[in-house]
Amino acid sequence: MLVTMKEILDRAKKDNYGVTSIMVDRSSLSYEDNIAQTKETVKMCRPLNISVEAELGHVGQSEDYSSDVSDHFTKPEEVKKFVEETGSDCLAVAIGTAHGRYHGTPHIDFDLLKQITDVVDIPLVLHGGSGTGDENLRKAVKNGIQKVNLATELVVAGKE
């Protein structure tokens, strides 16, 4: 059963689920469609006091990860307009990480992260934090990341 975002938010409002935030990933769409759909999600969430995390650039899967993923990186020149037009509360950025287990250590573009940090003042999010390494995580936080997703490590720990 495919449930729409509107149905989820309607249920959350009606049944008082206590939802405080959501993550909307429309990064596989065109830039314009990502803006339009994210903006619509923010519009539905605001009256419910639900914060919205969006993604700009595309954080792929680790099995598809290669050293040449920069085509999907977040573009600093698009960030400010995206945040202003969507009203997103925080932004997941694509700077060299991927979801899932890595074969090796990812190559994070910290210069790109700094450029992104310089153009927006909302919290930035790093997806694909599992297996990134302590030094990379410390450096990411030092350079503007305020939330790190570590789902793979939690799933693995839960299975052990």
Regions found by a protein language model. Give the residues of each.
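Alpha/beta enzyme core
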Residues: L2-I122, D134-I145, L150
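Thr-Gly-centered strand-to-loop micro-motif
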Residues: L126-G128
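Conserved His + Asp/Glu catalytic blocks
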Residues: A157
